[in-house]
A protein has these predicted regions:
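Glycine/tryptophan-enriched, flexible segments
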Residues: 124-265, 372-433
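Trp/Phe/Arg-rich N-terminal binding region typifying the photolyase-homology
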Residues: 1-145, 232, 341, 424-429, ...
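Residue-level preference for long, well-ordered alpha-helices that form the structural scaffold
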Residues: 41, 45, 282, 286, ...
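A broad detector of short, well-ordered amphipathic alpha-helices
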Residues: 17, 291, 416-420
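Soluble or luminal CAZymes and related metallo-dependent hydrolases
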Residues: 44, 48, 90, 175, ...
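An acidic- and aromatic-residue-enriched active-site/binding cleft used to recognize and process polar
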Residues: 5-7, 30, 65, 86-87, ...
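Active-site-proximal binding-pocket segments
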Residues: 205-385
Length: 433
């Protein structure tokens, strides 16, 4: 029996290859309702499962309920259980419950090129800083993509094992074939300029692979195997390593999905998440680059990575709201929402995490817009109330007579004032001499 989890593909799948070597395989997926999810992630999962089912010739068994109870019944019927190992706090807790119930899972492979916990210092402790982690991560290396030993014979599901979730909202294209096509297209068209253009919000030059990696529709090994030593390829390799670094950090510090990596920041003065938070959520802060990012997130379930940092900095250091509020909102809205990358991406910007940008680094939302959306085309796409303004005006519409004439809101705070306030609150944490 092959238990699919965050690995919804057939290619480069060590656990599936191991299961196939034992003979006939029952491919299964269990919908565990004890795990909270958003409408967007649930709908994306539904589409990805449908794509996987097509690849399996309509033989995917989909169950609904408690994994322990379901697997007890299935193991008596089908025998050995194979699965890709998972490393999030909830997945580890689930697998401990399975072990307590004396259910043996044959874990083969992981969602990462290098399994969390393998990259360590010479004294055996985990890395807290990305750059030395990256060097050892590269030195540890990864296997070549695996192949299925032969076309397996799938065990057909009974009628009561087809409990697919429903698609209840608009979703982007999903599935293994889509992921592979996207990777090939990015490799041919945009990867060569990735080091120069990846931060430009107005250029559609990012990989678009985040959601496919999150759901295991493509394995990072498949991508890494095709990268060379050019500057652009090296920068992209480092971005994949950031994902693996954050997974490693969360593996060693599982409380940091919701709590501070640096506990002293829990003592900082924060504001309640009231009307200002609502304005941030809806893209109505009065800062065009911030609002464009939030409106893209709300409309599409995705946001450019540069914008993720800018809007996070604005929430934490301009509005003085704790990072967890923003992280939860991202988890609700993003199709690519990943516990480790989301929590530690937020903590990096907040200055509270491992290898973090220091708290005193405050992104200027106006200058960020000018630098990474110089003509204002990204802003105008998502904030049409500013489409009438020239490129020189769109980043500070409040300075111009007709800047707010089409319904765009006034600024809810003054950035310069709130930057000083953020630094003052940071100073309060320092011990007095």
């Amino acid at each position: 029996m092959m238990w699919f989890r965050r690995d919804l593909r057939l290619g480069d799948h060590p656990a599936l290859a191991a299961a196939v070597r034992t003979g006939e395989v029952a491919p299964i997926y269990i919908r565990d309702h004890s795990l909270a999810t958003s409408e967007r992630r649930s709908s994306y999962l539904a589409a990805s499962l449908q794509a996987l089912d097509e690849s399996l010739g309509g033989n995917l068994h989909v169950f609904e309920g408690n994994p322990v109870e379901i697997l007890k019944k299935l193991s008596a019927q089908y025998g050995e259980i194979f699965a890709t190992e998972e490393f999030t706090p909830r997945a580890i807790l689930r697998d401990k419950k399975l072990a307590k119930a004396q259910l043996t899972i044959n874990h083969v492979g992981s969602p990462y090129a290098v399994t969390p916990g393998r990259v360590r210092k010479s004294d055996g402790t985990p890395y807290r800083v990305y750059t030395p982690f990256y060097k050892v991560w590269c030195a540890v290396g990864w296997r070549a993509p695996s192949e299925l030993p032969a076309l397996p014979k799938w065990i057909s599901p009974p009628p009561d094992a087809r409990k697919f979730p429903k698609i209840t909202c608009e979703i982007p294209a999903s599935g293994e074939l889509v992921a592979l096509d996207r990777w090939r297209d990015f490799y041919k068209t945009d990867l060569a300029r990735y080091d120069e253009e990846r931060n430009r919000a107005d250029l559609n030059t990012t990989s678009g692979l985040a959601r496919h990696l999150r759901w295991g529709e493509i394995h990072p090994r498949t991508i890494l195997a095709e990268l060379n030593q050019t500057e652009a390829h090296d920068v992209f390799r480092k971005e994949i390593a950031w994902r693996e670094f954050y997974a490693d950090v969360l593996f060693h510090e599982p409380h940091t999905n919701l709590d501070y990596y640096k506990p002293e920041f829990s003592r900082m003065r924060y504001n309640e998440a009231g009307k200002a938070f609502e304005a941030w959520c809806h893209g109505k802060t009065g800062y065009p680059f911030v609002d464009a990012g939030m409106r893209q997130l709300n409309a599409e379930g995705w946001m450019h990575n540069r914008l993720r940092m800018v809007v996070a900095s604005f929430l934490i250091k301009d509005l003085h709201i704790e990072w967890q509020h923003g992280a939860r909102y991202f988890m609700e809205k993003l199709f690519d929402a990943d516990v480790a990358s989301n929590a530690h991406g937020w903590q990096w910007t907040a200055g509270t995490g491992t290898d973090a940008s220091p708290y005193y680094r405050v992104f200027n939302p106006i200058e960020q817009g000018r630098r990474f959306d110089p003509e204002g085309s990204y802003i105008k796409k998502y904030v049409p109330e500013l489409a009438h303004l020239a490129a020189s005006e769109v980043h500070e519409p409040w300075l111009y007579l007709d800047g707010l004439s089409h319904g765009y809101p006034e600024r809810i705070v003054d950035h310069a004032t709130e930057r000083h306030e953020a630094l003052a609150r940071l100073a309060e944490l320092k011990p007095r001499s």
